[in-house]
Design a protein with these regions (language model features):
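Leucine-rich repeat
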Residues: 1-450, 454, 458, 476, ...
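C-terminal recognition-helix end and immediately following basic linker
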Residues: 451-452, 456-524
């Protein structure tokens, strides 16, 4: 049946096959002489490429093949195997055909890099370039390694490009530009980099990830020079990691009206300079309010995430630092710069579930300063170890006639509270809600997650009745303190448990333990309705 198909139909069939597996065109060519003739007479229509990769004798066979475009693939990303030492001759044999190289995906070692200066001329047909240093070494490419105007994708990891802005300027067709873990010697001025982006109307992804602080900061000490902004109309994803001043100088020079995803991580600095960041975000063509903001404190970072419900737009900004007071100081500075934008936020959440320990001299005013930026917030979600401190700070501010979150209507408590911490936490919730009601600004309270946690098995419950039922069914006659999950005692020495309660959990009503262990009834001086 296949013998009656004309050549044009066979070419279309081959094209569909090679769209999925482009490197296997030679398999089709070995089926029969007729197919081989069709393939070699349609190299452009079938986008034929010679794939130079592991376990292929490139050096010995390259000159015997037709002069097809070359794909050099020896690593280039953490997911791919790096080249072996015996691959270096094959790699260089392919790279020396620079005018034919269409794509390079390469993990570069120091020994391989030493051969790069002999590469003749530019990679004039290069469309895709992905380079990664081997063994986390910081490498600098020789000036002889450069490309032409056809480049569409550039990825690098721990690779420094001499005069990168000059190299990028001709690459007007770039779609994807990701430079990660840029070594100190690879720093380039933000203004020159912005100028190099001029005319890149197809650029969709831009990612800059600096490995460390710049070796010299002379070009970052002055404010960004005035000038026309570079418009990147197709840019939808922008990611950055480095110091705030570099970011500020860069975003002062570019407009990206259709950005969808923004991911920024700033190095820890006492003073953050991001005065142009708010204007940059405001120039993004997003639909109007309401916006949702989530502030998350973890052991090593604090982040603010801004999303727009109903869209895929997302801005995430992280600051790398460990101490909670430093985290708050940094995020407050960022919120000051974003204040023209944040006043539209109607849904605010603060989660300190994974935060580091709170300093003893922690100033509650830092929480107040943070929340002052969200004067339009109608919904407030609070969770984590600092939930009690946050609500106390809100209550104290209200008492001092300094109303924070004046538009607040709904308080969502997302908290798993152990019995040890439940008393102070519940007091802070009730005090704040009562204060708002008395001031004529009632707040509706919602418990969104577990309020009680069994410390024996770490299971959380929203309702007290469910918590008690769990203790009866899962831990009957369990001689382990359910309030801390640490203290244990024997049945013959029940008095030790009561002593433990008095010293470690004085807020716990002793009669409640009868539900857990009826054997203690003779030791309880009074009774109490546990359901109250």
């Amino acid at each position: 049946m296949i013998e009656v198909l004309c050549n044009d139909i066979l070419v279309n069939i081959f094209r569909h096959y090679l769209d999925v597996s482009p490197q296997f065109w030679f398999t089709l060519g070995h089926v029969c002489r007729s197919w081989r003739r069709i393939i070699f007479t349609s190299p452009l229509g079938l986008c034929l490429r010679l794939h130079c990769t592991h376990r292929k004798p490139v050096l010995k066979t390259l000159d015997y093949w037709p002069p097809l475009p070359l794909v050099v693939n020896y690593g280039g990303s953490p997911r791919l195997h790096p080249p072996a030492p015996e691959d270096e001759e094959n790699i260089m044999a392919a790279l020396e055909k620079a005018a034919r190289v269409h794509s390079i995906s390469l993990t570069v070692s120091n020994s391989l890099l030493k051969h790069f200066p002999i590469i003749p001329g530019p990679f004039s047909e290069l469309e895709e370039l992905s380079l990664q240093s081997q063994d986390n070494a910081q490498l600098t490419l020789p000036s002889a390694f450069w490309w032409g105007h056809r480049l569409r994708m550039l990825h690098s990891t721990r690779i420094a490009f001499p005069s990168l802005p000059h190299l990028l300027s001709p690459s007007q067709d770039l779609v994807d530009l990701q430079l990660h873990e840029i070594p100190g010697v690879g720093y380039f001025p933000p203004e020159a980099f912005a100028d190099a982006l001029c005319g890149m109307i197809q650029l969709q992804t831009l990612s800059l990830h600096f490995l460390s602080l710049p070796p010299r900061r002379t070009y970052l000490t002055l404010p960004p020079p005035p000038g026309d902004r570079i418009v990147l109309p197709a840019l939808t994803c922008f990611k950055y990691r480095g110091i705030s001043k570099y970011l500020d100088s860069l975003v002062a020079r570019i407009d990206a009206p259709h950005l969808v995803v923004i991911g920024i991580t700033l190095f820890n600095q006492p003073t953050l300079d991001a005065s142009h960041l708010g204007s940059f975000i405001n120039r993004i063509e997003m639909q109007g309010s309401p916006y949702r903001v989530d502030i998350l404190s973890s052991g090593g970072t604090i982040s603010i995430t801004i999303t727009h419900p109903g869209t895929v737009t997302k801005l995430e900004l992280k600051i790398s630092c460990k101490q909670l007071d430093w985290q708050l100081s940094s995020i407050c500075q960022i919120c000051d710069y974003l204040s023209p934008f944040l006043f539209r936020v109607e849904d605010l959440g603060i989660d300190t579930t994974g935060s580091s320990s709170v300093p003893d001299d922690m100033d509650a005013e830092q929480w107040v300063r943070l929340m002052l930026a969200f004067r339009s917030a109608k919904d407030f979600r609070v969770a984590g170890e600092c939930a009690t401190d946050i609500l106390r700070a809100l209550h104290s501010a209200d008492e001092g006639q300094k109303t924070v979150l004046p538009a607040l209507r709904n308080l969502h408590v997302q908290e798993r509270v152990s019995m040890l911490d439940f008393g102070p936490f519940q007091d802070s919730v009730e005090s704040f809600v009562t204060q708002r009601r008395l001031s004529g600004h009632s707040v509706q309270l919602y418990y969104s997650e577990s309020r009680y946690t069994c410390q024996i098995c770490c299971v959380g419950f929203r309702l007290w009745q469910d918590f008690i039922r769990h203790l009866k069914e899962k831990h009957p006659h369990q001689y382990m303190c359910p309030y801390c999950g640490i203290f244990q005692w024997s049945k013959e020495r029940n008095y030790l448990f009561l002593e433990h309660l008095e010293s470690e959990h004085p807020e716990v009503v002793p009669a409640d333990v009868l539900i857990l262990n009826p054997d203690l009834e003779s030791f309880i001086p009074y009774s109490h309705d546990a359901g109250q």
